[in-house]
Amino acid sequence: MMALVMSVTMMAEDRVLAAAKDQKPRSPEEIPASLSLSLSEAQDYAVKQNRTLKNASLAVQEAYAQRWQTIAAMLPQADGSYTYSNYCGYTAEMTMMGNKININMPNVGALGVTASIGINGQGVVGALLNNIAIDMKKIALEKSEDELRSSIMSSYVSVLALQSITNLLDSSLNNIQNLERITQNAVNAGAAEQTSADQIRVRVNTLKNNINTQKRNIELATNSLKVLLDVPVETELTLTDNIDHILSPERVLTLLATDFDIRNNLNYQQVAKSAELAKRNVHMASWAYGPTISLAYNYSNQQYYGEGGMRMTPPNTVQVRVAMPLWSSGKRAAGVIEKKIAYEEAKNTLSEMTDNLAIQYRQLCFNLTNAYETYINEKDNIEVSQRVFNSATEKFKWGAASNLELTNASNDLINAQSTYVNAMLTLINAQADLEEFLNK
């Protein structure tokens, strides 16, 4: 029995220590100088490297260790001791029937071994409570992972969107700069006024400022993504996915067609486990009325180093003990009532969440549908605005459009680009929210 206990104990310790070793910091050699990642690869990489997620994983291992402590407390326990006593030549005196008797007190060594086992209802329920705690830690870990994946997707798409807009602005800038050169040549030849060239120069500077702003936004978004990936800012990051693949109609429609199973929702699972925990706490409080049964074995061996000495302690002792609580002035009863009230509160919270989640699901589906429709419209708007701008540029080149028309077309394109980015980010956030809600 003791060999089995030692074996299980060592297995539990090895499991916790192995998990802790897996979390060791990376050496400089393990930090990549460059990374090329698709969206799914970025999410998997972040799940593996993110420190917050590592802590959540360690919390699960910690819960396993706590459960083993509870179980081990109900398994056999053994303690050994050795005591050496030196009486420094002392001789005890006893008077018996008027006669004094001297008793030598030799040095003595005492070896003692105690083995015991005790169990009660609260200990058993405590082990069940630890199981629920482990489940809750696992749910929290899964929830943290889902939140991290959603954050990675939003950050990843933000970088792609800003890069796409910057490319469009670069193309528009090239067209405007060509017009600037043509107009300035016309001014130099006396075929146009300097005002026309100056107005186009203003548009050129405006686009340059806009491009510079977008480039700084790209750097900021990329650094935010690097933080989530837990890589240094010096690491060169290349995103290999494209927006059309991530924001595909098929993906959105498939998500909207997914049936809602409340049991898959992580928030529901957490509250349900809390209600189960509250129920077990009622059982725990009720077992305060239960008995505690314990069994103990004591072995004692005394060795006298010298003459004399009396062996008055039996070498082997077996004890069986049953302890039963009798009276606590209502303390235990109040404890049971308290836990029952807490259980009722937990059930009410669970019922309320069940209703709220059904409403939240409909709202998230509405948000995704609305965001997708807006994205499609804004995507079409930016294509139309780009065509209008290209047409106005070409007309202006041949004198068929005024500076005002060119300026309006340029402003419309910039506004369309800004609105398009906002629509794109709104869509990806709505998609991530519904995926996280459905635990997909």
Write out the residue ranges for each language-model feature.
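Acidic, low-complexity, intrinsically disordered peripheral segments
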Residues: 2, 11-31, 233, 419-440
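Transmembrane beta-barrel domains of outer membrane proteins
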Residues: 71, 114-118, 286, 323
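Hydrophobic, lipid-facing positions within transmembrane beta-strands of outer-membrane proteins
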Residues: 109-115, 316-322
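Small/polar (Gly/Ser/Thr/Ala-rich) solvent-exposed segments
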Residues: 54, 77-95, 117-147, 269, ...
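Periplasmic alpha-helical coiled-coil/stalk elements that build and connect Gram-negative outer-membrane
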Residues: 22, 37, 147-262, 364-367, ...
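Alpha-helical hairpins and coiled-coil heptad-repeat segments
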Residues: 180-197, 388-406
